[in-house]
Amino acid sequence: MAKVVGIDLGTTNSCVAVMEGGKPTVIANAEGFRTTPSVVAFAKNQDRLVGQIAKRQAVMNPENTFYSVKRFIGRRPDEVTNELTEVAYKVDTSGNAVKLDSSNAGKQFAPEEISAQVLRKLAEDASKYLGETVTQAVIPVPAYFNDSQRQATKDAGKIAGLEVLRIINEPTAAALAYGLDKKSNERILVFDLGGGTFDVSVLEVGDGVFEVLATSGDTHLGGDDFDKKIVDFLAGEFQKNEGIDLRKDKQALQRLTEAAEKAKIELSSATQTEINLPFITATQDGPKHLDLTLTRAKFEELASDLIDRCRIPVEQAIKDAKLALSEIDEIVLVGGSTRIPAVQAIVKQMTGKEPNQSVNPDEVVAIGAAIQGGVLAGEVKDILLLDVTPLSLGVETLGGVMTKLIPRNTTIPTKKSETFSTAADGQTNVEIHVLQGEREMASDNKSLGTFRLDGIPPAPRGVPQIEVIFVIDANGILNVTAKDKGSGKEQSISITGASTLSDNEVDRMVKDAEANAAADKERRERIDLKNQADTLVYQSEKQLSELGDKISADEKSKVEGFIQELKDALAAEDYDKIRSIIEQLQQALYAAGSSVYQQASAEASANAQAGPSSSSSSSSGDDDVIDAEFSESK
């Protein structure tokens, strides 16, 4: 069976892993790194850049460099108000869906399309490593992702040309990686603070069984928020001193964001860091520079509210699991933001335990996804994963109330049904409004979609019996069916959420991505051809110089002619001609080289024939003969 990879599509960085020889292996990307920045950019010539190369040019191209896209995926425009102020690129929220605007590409992209580019790169890098095309993947998502966000992640995989075999929760994936070899039963709390989201899951792990007891989280809390605290501090100090708000300058904002991330990382190991941003802006008085010292204590003061927000999901998960903190055996830290000392301190303070840091927080989720991929591919045996749905699911009933059919933390896959009736005499149809959330009123919860059941025979109110069935699959994705028991009429909906893409949009994006992949391949081949031609020109000129008079004037002229033709073809970017002349130039060089060897061979042969007569005449005298004296060693 083909290999199934695990891809951790992170807010800040992404990672891919695979099972090899019964063990999970992290696959380095084409650049040699084990993680890849989740960044996609469009250059002025419309070239698409992904990963490290995209991140490096962000300062010079802030409006066409897309990062932290995971915070927009599967969300409606009214759900991303806070995120809009944290990015330098333009986010269009005027329609029914969030769109990311690229002036260089001349079009708008859905967040799923941008995420798909990161997934495609990781899949291609994995394909090169494995020597076979990767088409199947397991993709983890934050445990607190709602149905729309899960479906959107699956759509991103489809656009990338991947069959997403399973969507699993990130803390659960981390627990798989941590507990793969655990024999004794342990209760573990996974504290997953990534770049854009925060999850807490409580699990029982042992003898190959991974049972999620409860999960909680905050999808608006992550490393990006810590960065923003530093950005606001730097911008505020600069505005205080210079009267200029750097946040209004896209390029300056991008530089501040990069400096903030760097400072945050440095403060995990140092007690203070210098932030120097020369020429951050300019006025009529000349250039302005930003030069500040940020201490760890000041950073912790700035981020104190964020650190406090970490408490609530931990307390909620423990409560839902019906456990006391003293009953937790291990605290496993996941996500790059758990390297922040203040975060580690609050975990220790809350639990009274030293956090377990035996796993790499940047790689553990991808490793767990690879293990799940191994389970699905039949490579890994004797593992049972029992995950849960993070939020309650239900329908709107009379009076605008949410009636829950599936409570949060229900083990999945699951199926639940409830029988409802009509609210008016003679009512022949009902509208089913599907909701997700914990509030009592329907309007306070997340709307996942609506559908109508028609053809109900007229009857007094309360008489018709309408069965509503909720089915959650192993991916945590919901299907809802409504059936009138009297007439047998049935209607169903696969919930995709108002903010995600229609099937037609996904299909179009898949075709666009395939076309772009072909264009990218052609562009890469052209670059490789130009590089090959440039190298050949250099080597040919060097070889002619070294050979000098050893080749005939005709051969030299022929090679020089092809070199000039190749230079002209390169200037004109005539790739067919470049290909043709490369071949002709190589043949001319081979011919010139052969003639030099033939000439050298002929000269050596002539010298060999003349050699014996000259040597015998010179040896006839004994003027040059030296007698050696030997002494016998005893």
Curated annotation (Swiss-Prot):
Region Disordered: start and end of each range? 600-634
Q: What is this protein called?
A: Chaperone protein DnaK 2
The species is Synechococcus sp. (strain ATCC 27144 / PCC 6301 / SAUG 1402/1)
Q: Name one GO molecular function term.
A: ATP binding
InterPro entries named in the record: ATPase_NBD, Chaperone_DnaK, Heat_shock_70_CS, HSP70_C_sf, HSP70_peptide-bd_sf, Hsp_70_fam
**In what ranges is there compositional bias, type Low complexity?**
600-620
Which residues get modified to Phosphothreonine? 197
Determine the domain of life of the protein's source.
Bacteria
Tell me its family.
Belongs to the heat shock protein 70 family.
- Give the Acidic residues compositional bias ranges: 621-634
Q: Does the keyword Chaperone apply?
A: yes
